Regions:
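ATP-binding/phosphotransfer module of carbohydrate and carboxylate kinases, centering on a glycine-rich
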Residues: 6-8, 27, 31-35, 52-53, ...
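Short secondary-structure boundary segments
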Residues: 41, 67-69, 160-161, 189
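Conserved Rossmann-like nucleotide-binding pocket used by diverse enzymes
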Residues: 13, 63, 190
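Glycine-rich phosphate-binding loop of actin/hexokinase-like ATP-binding domains
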Residues: 58-109
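Residues that form or immediately flank small-molecule/cofactor binding pockets and catalytic motifs
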Residues: 42-44, 86, 194
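Short, conserved loop/turn and helix-capping segments at secondary-structure boundaries
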Residues: 19-23, 86-89, 112
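Mid-protein regulatory/catalytic core that forms ligand/cofactor-binding pockets
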Residues: 1-58, 69, 76
């Protein structure tokens, strides 16, 4: 789900779907299906998926950044998702990237209505679009550097609708980040592996961790192997279809 989601599955606040703020989605699903239900923030679940099944399986401290219509973060610290006392850990889009976002957290573009149009114009040689894209990358790198110095992760994973733009986003971002960090070491920056199905895969892991003990009667039962869907069969995220 988009927004702050508490342990019971209630949406505390959602700027993406304001009408859901205060809705007890978890209770509604439990009543509808008559079984235990676990609900969480979608970007946090995507981070869980990349840690268990994706590109970050070998590290336990991960910043997962979803870059699409908005910028959101999921944190894995010590091998576990970091929720925070108010379940707000990672809700940093409007703070760490203030120069990129509107009040609703949506990325604002000047030279075209959508990111796809800005990227296409830049590829076609439009100087204004390329300048805007360069400024976007520098602002993104600065925000990531701030988060990196706060968390000191072993890996940064970029997901969301813009993550597949290697030559226009990921490669320039890899070049810009060391300038903003100024550190004698580099933090690996990788593209998310699970695409639009990352949150769904993370939900499977999350549900197993929450309910396996009730089902099997075994505490701390490890998550069994899960075979991710091939990347080319993953359905697009809402960020990619807008």
């Amino acid at each position: 789900l988009p927004g702050l989601v508490d342990d019971a599955g209630r949406v505390v606040l959602s700027v993406v779907i304001p009408e859901w703020s205060g809705a007890d989605i978890g209770a509604q699903l439990r009543q509808a299906f008559g079984c235990p239900v676990s609900v969480d923030n979608g970007v946090r679940l995507a981070a869980v998926a990349e840690h268990h099944l994706g590109v970050a399986q070998l590290v336990d401290d991960v910043i997962y950044l979803s870059v699409g219509n908005r910028i959101s973060m999921g944190l894995i610290l010590g091998g576990r998702p970091r929720r925070g006392i108010h379940n707000a850990a990672g809700d940093i889009g409007r703070l760490a990237f203030r120069g990129l976002n509107t009040e609703t957290g949506q990325i604002s573009w000047r030279t075209a209505p959508t990111a796809a149009e800005v990227f296409a114009a830049a590829r076609a040689g439009d100087r204004a679009a390329q300048d805007e894209l360069d400024a976007f990358i520098e602002e993104l790198a600065h925000g990531i550097a701030t988060l990196t110095m706060t968390v000191d992760p072993a890996m940064i994973v970029i997901g969301g609708g813009l993550s597949a733009a290697h030559e226009q986003l990921l490669d320039p971002l890899r070049q810009a980040l060391p300038r903003h960090l100024g550190l004698p070491f580099q933090v690996p920056l990788a593209e998310a592996r699970l695409g639009g199905e990352a949150a769904a895969h993370g939900a499977v892991v999350h549900a197993f961790q929450r309910h396996a003990a009730d089902i099997y009667g075994i505490d701390d039962m490890p998550v069994p192997p899960i075979t991710p869907l091939p990347h080319d069969t993953a359905s697009p995220t809402p960020e990619e279809t807008k």
